[in-house]
Design a protein with these regions (language model features):
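Short, well-ordered beta-strand segments in beta-rich or mixed alpha/beta enzyme
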Residues: 3-10, 39-74
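Short acidic, gly/pro-rich beta-turn/loop elements at beta-sheet edges
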Residues: 17-19, 66-68, 105
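Functionally constrained cores in energy, signaling, and assembly domains
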Residues: 2, 6-9, 23, 30, ...
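A short, structured loop/turn motif at beta-sheet edges
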Residues: 13-15, 32, 61-63, 102
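Glycine-rich beta-strand-turn "strand-cap" elements at beta-sheet edges
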Residues: 37-55, 78-105
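Short amphipathic alpha-helical segments
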Residues: 15-41, 74, 78-82
């Protein structure tokens, strides 16, 4: 069962530039490292999340793969170094999982 994992980070709106500059470094890290899952980044315009949020999402084959990715992020030094710089701008983090529905016959 395919699963979409979303990591939603609400950041301090007065620090949007600094937060996004660090997020660009995360995107560069994904491109540089083939072991990193490549996520799609979204910022709400009109949604259930505030406009000062960044959503990273990726589709996984199953929920186990999604959980393994969270473990990977937590254990990767480059990721942790960047996250430690970004964490001061983050007000809230949520992680959501969605089952991908496929009604093809």
């Amino acid at each position: 069962m395919a699963v979409i994992m979303r990591i939603i980070q609400q950041f301090d709106p007065s620090c949007e530039k600094e937060f996004m500059d660090l997020e660009k470094q995360f995107a560069a890290l994904e491109k540089k490292r083939p072991d990193f899952p490549t996520g799609k980044r979204l910022q709400p315009i009109s949604a259930g999340e505030p406009v000062n949020a960044l959503i990273w999402q990726h589709e996984f084959e199953n929920i186990e793969s999604a959980y393994m990715t969270l473990d990977f992020f937590g254990g990767d030094r480059e990721h942790e170094d960047l996250f430690s710089k970004q964490a001061g701008y983050i007000k809230q983090v949520k992680i959501e999982f969605f089952r991908v529905l496929d009604f093809k016959e």
